[in-house]
Amino acid sequence: MVRRASSMGFESWWRRAESVGFCAHPIQLVGADEYRRDRVVWTRCNNRRAHICPSCSDLYARDTWQLVHAGAAGGHHGMPITVADRPQVFLTLTAPSYGAVHAATRGGDGKRGVCRDHHRIGGYRRCPHGKPLWCSTVHDHGEGRVGQPLCSECYDYVGHVLFTWHLPELWRRFTITLRRALHKELKATGVDPDGVRVSFIKIIELQVRAIPHIHALIRLDPHENGDDPDQTDWESPTSATKLAAIIEHAARTVTLALTDPTTDSAVRRIRFGTQIDTQPLTASSAPEKTGSAEQNSGIAGSLSGRRVARYLAKYVTKSLADLGISARRLSTEAIGDLDVSEHVRAILTTISALADKGLSGIKLRPGK
């Protein structure tokens, strides 16, 4: 290292690396200036994935924190400080259970617990394939078995893939359902529903069982007014607690009907899981509990805009690489050679099988 630092050209290299924030994959831009002289400029790759570029992903996470915090607490980036007084709810939407998986659990006292206590599941029961439905092991969070099915034959891989693929559409329908429910609630109380609008920011987090769930910050705003864009004197017609109740009801009622690809005529309904968490934010940062389990969102205790911003920024740099999957397209033939868990391999195999059935939108690159 000392030899390299004292070598010729090191200072020039250092200045170039420093100019792009020590990006792992800087991009060289070649062009001409206004006098038609050749010029070379280096710029960041701007990849948000931490495993590809730690520097750019860190910058992306910091930018995300700034944007979320500005929207939640105000006071910078053109957002008025009064935005913190508007009803805001931190929402977590999980996926349904498609089969029992190994888990790293903690009790109410914070101590680690056994994976699946036989007392909790009704004794030493086995699945139809003879696999035990209990697990007395205390798993660590980084352990390879965490997230793996207790019985891969029982696990509903088709449902897993369909939920993942149709999650964007399910979210879109949720936002429509929420706006309609809010419109109905405000109209019933004598408030003009056209005077408010709902703002969202969401990120996707991949659970250890390799299925996505959603974290979102939802805020109630006044409709834009050209004469007073900040509308600092606006008073919300409803509270954060009431907004949280409307959000939870919308999330529990929205569904998406699909033709089951495993049968000729059956219909499969895609919906969010039962673990839906809504946590209102208040200007005083004191949490208003709505009955949902706080641990579902990963944020316990006092909830503020700063904490929500930090939590969302933490996950925007994650990617499929955490499961051992490259961001590049895969061929069906390559699935068997991937260095991934059997659970992930089964998911990819299911995607391939559904693609062969001609399921809309799901495709794999054909082998060469």
Feature roles, as predicted:
Residues 1-61, 70, 274-368:
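Long, low-complexity, charged/polar intrinsically disordered accessory regions
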